[in-house]
């Protein structure tokens, strides 16, 4: 069993476990996410977010769901990520560049809050990317 320091945060109803991987390789992050995020036998969280060095931005953020699958981005997660790196003294910047699987995201700290431009929302059902086993309905119920 390894000893692992972590921080738990929440944003708008989503909760996250954060692990700093800037200096340490902690192993299989998908397996760690499954254990830490388990609400019955672990810490319990929606996602594991990890902080890594980046060659193209201030930091790199990796996100793992509770089932161990990796995802591109999470709006509430990036806000908590920005707060985490600032609160833990990893940066003094108020405007950050964070590398994600969805590209570079630029959160901005404004007082105790974090703003993120997530781009234009996709509101048209046929344009929203979906993977499903079965027919996809394109109507409001």
Predicted regions and their residues:
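ATP-dependent small-molecule kinase catalytic core of the GHMP/sugar-kinase superfamily
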Residues: 90, 99-141
């Amino acid at each position: 069993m390894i000893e692992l320091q972590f921080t738990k945060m929440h944003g708008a109803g989503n909760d996250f476990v954060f692990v700093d991987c800037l200096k340490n390789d902690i192993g299989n992050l998908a397996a760690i996410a499954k254990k830490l995020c388990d609400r019955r036998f672990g810490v319990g969280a929606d996602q594991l977010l990890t902080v890594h060095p980046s060659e193209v931005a201030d930091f790199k953020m990796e996100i793992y769901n509770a089932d161990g699958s990796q995802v591109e981005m999470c709006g509430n997660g990036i806000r908590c990520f920005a707060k985490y790196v600032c609160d833990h003294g990893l940066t003094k910047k108020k405007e950050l560049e964070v590398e994600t699987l969805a590209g570079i995201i630029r959160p901005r700290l404004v007082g105790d809050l974090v703003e993120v431009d997530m781009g234009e929302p996709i509101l048209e059902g046929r344009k929203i990317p979906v993977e499903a086993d079965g027919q996809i309905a394109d109507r409001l119920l």
